Amino acid sequence: MILEKKNRLGKKLLATGNGRCNFTNKVQKKECYRGKDANFAWNAMQHFSAEDAIEWFDQIGILATDKNGYMYPAANQATVVLHALENELKRQKVEVKLEEAVLSVQKDSKRNDGFVVTTDQDSYIAKRVIVATGGMAAPVHGSTGDGYEFAAAFGHQLVLPASALTSIVLEGNFMKKWSGIRIKGEVFLYDQDDELLAKDRGEIQMVAYGISGIPVFQVSRFAAVELQKKRKPYLVLDSMPDYSKEWIVKQIVRRAEWNPKQSFGDLIEGLLPDKLGLVFLQQCHIDPASKAEQCL
């Protein structure tokens, strides 16, 4: 039996992978796990690997396609994954109850094993219970933190939830000027004592409120923990990670020597996207219209 408090199954699944549903990843190593005990996750994953997942989804009708290790349905639509899962539930004759919220999960005091699951409509006896509530990241899809209450009721110690795999909001009012830009770059996250907490590299997206993209997602949890501690982490963005600082300086000087009367805005054109270069100049208090000869 599945108890679902929303009016349909899979609302959160439909939002995964930007609506494409990457259902597993071929790159599964201990260092991919971001918690303190990598063995905890690693041992569990050995019982059902990425290859097992790909094979199982193929059996229920989902042809997989590989994008840099991310496994998507070949149709590139999360809806086909949801429909395949729903069809499998029907084949297995699994009873599904919609719009029925679980209120509590408790040990069955009348039996040596089993559980009593109480909902807003009824109660059920079960030998096994899988709590698949999600965290608190997407309340609109039903993840409102219920699972934490169920876990605490069984005596589990809870770690204060923090945001993860998310964009980072930056201070300042310049971000609207760079909104929409994507670059191949590297982000470094430091704590307020200038200690490096995390770094990652890949496609970075500039948005109106800050910075986003997979590299930012990967370091965001460390920023969230620092903010929970009332500390002030900061980001360093390398927008040209394939080039050294010395090489970039030489390029700027060479361009200035070639045409000292050109503006700074024109000087850095071709090195960076226009909007990003202008933001960098303004943050450094350099007038984009000033002449390049000033840097010689």
Residue spans for each PLM region:
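Short hydrophobic core segments
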Residues: 1-3, 102, 123-140, 151-152, ...
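An anion/pyrophosphate-binding glycine-rich loop and adjacent beta-alpha core
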Residues: 7-9, 14-15, 23-30, 157-160, ...
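Flexible, glycine/proline-enriched loop segments at strand-loop-helix junctions
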Residues: 41-44, 71-76, 133-141
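Glycine-rich loop(s) and the adjacent beta-strand/alpha-helix scaffold that form part
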Residues: 128-174
